[in-house]
A protein has these predicted regions:
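Conserved small/polar residues in nucleotide/adenosyl-binding loops
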Residues: 1-2, 308-311
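Substrate-recognition/specificity elements adjacent to catalytic centers across diverse enzyme folds
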Residues: 3-200, 212-214, 218-221, 227, ...
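A short secondary-structure junction signal
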Residues: 200-203, 249-251
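A short alpha/beta connector and helix-capping loop motif
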Residues: 204-210
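Ser/Thr- (and often Asn-) enriched beta-sheet segments in non-cytosolic proteins
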Residues: 276-280, 288-294
């Protein structure tokens, strides 16, 4: 495996196999963005509050309420192909190798990084990127924010669509392609103009990864991602924009008046799944504390108790 950097410092990683390349890809990212990657680990693991106190408790509860780690533990070997597992495991190994060779730059308490850390990080990042956290905040308000919808074929439109216009034209992230016959030199071009910050955990990081078994892609990603998020290969190029696709369904459950832990489904009262999660905190920077909270789930997914209904 070889890492070469061009005049702009962009890493070009060449490996014999895809896992070789993933190892080098992780190492190159760690060289440039170790602190960002390390700081994100507690967030994905649901133990941010150990390091940041009460500020991290809300996201820790979210991770545990969604059952992300239970999902990964149960399905890691079945939902991910052997090739994919080998790739993310090699990626985690690359991060750990960097940590082992730079002990003065790492926090040992957050190591080692595992392949499941990488997978859960990818899962949680995507949820937040399309606005799932906004839905969670909405259903936990004191009053219901919207009526129960009925089946419709209408296209979902963001509520603030009219506010994000300038001169009648939409503004924000965009991507556009130019076909060869519209280009003076006959080239195909793609402008990936997603509006991201220039620094921080969601600033684009550029890289090129290639293996001798077929992998060859260049583009941008967020630090800590095992794959290229926007970019191009020899045959295809793609971009992405930040938007609000309608990917979350919220159900209002009918609760048994005689048993608050039962809800109606298909004409029958069903028991809610009940569990208790522990959230570990460090208060005032030195005092360890553990808070226990009940989490509920129905056949539809995680349950939140709000405005006298279960959702």
């Amino acid at each position: 495996m070889v890492i070469r950097r061009d005049v702009r410092g962009v890493p070009h990683v060449l490996g014999a196999t895809d896992p070789d390349t993933a190892f080098g890809f992780a190492y190159a990212q760690a060289e440039d963005n170790w602190q960002l990657i390390e700081d994100a680990m507690p967030f994905y693991r649901g133990n941010s509050a150990v390091y940041s106190g009460m500020d991290g408790a809300v996201t820790d509860y979210l991770v545990k309420w969604l059952g992300l780690w239970e999902t990964v533990h149960e399905n890691y070997k079945w939902d991910l192909s052997p090739d994919t597992r080998a790739y993310v495991e090699a990626y985690a190994d690359g991060l750990n190798f960097y940590a082992a060779t730079h002990p003065d730059k790492v926090d040992e308490s957050k190591l080692p990084v595992t392949a499941k850390d990488v997978v859960v990080g990818h899962m949680l990042r995507h949820l937040l990127f399309y606005g799932f956290d906004g839905v969670v905040r909405e259903v936990n308000k004191a009053e219901r924010q919207r009526d129960i919808s009925t089946p419709s074929e209408a296209v979902a439109v963001p509520a603030d669509a009219k506010e994000i216009t300038l001169g009648g034209l939409p503004i924000g992230s965009n991507a556009f392609a130019i076909a060869p016959h519209f280009s003076e030199e006959g080239a195909t071009r793609l402008a990936i103009n997603s509006h991201q910050p220039t620094t921080g955990p969601v600033a684009w990081y550029e890289a090129h990864i290639q293996s001798k078994t077929g992998l060859n892609v260049m583009g941008g990603l967020f630090p800590g991602s095992p794959s290229i998020s926007v970019g191009f290969t020899e045959n295809i190029a793609w971009g992405a924009t930040v938007n609000r696709p309608d990917l979350v369904d919220v159900y209002v459950l009918e609760v048994n008046p005689d048993n608050e832990y039962q809800y109606r489904l298909d004409g029958e009262w069903r028991d809610l799944e009940r569990d208790e999660v522990d959230i570990k905190l460090t208060l005032w920077g030195f005092l360890p504390w553990t808070v226990s909270r009940e989490v509920l789930a129905s056949e539809h997914g995680p349950v939140s108790v709000s405005y006298t209904h279960l959702t």
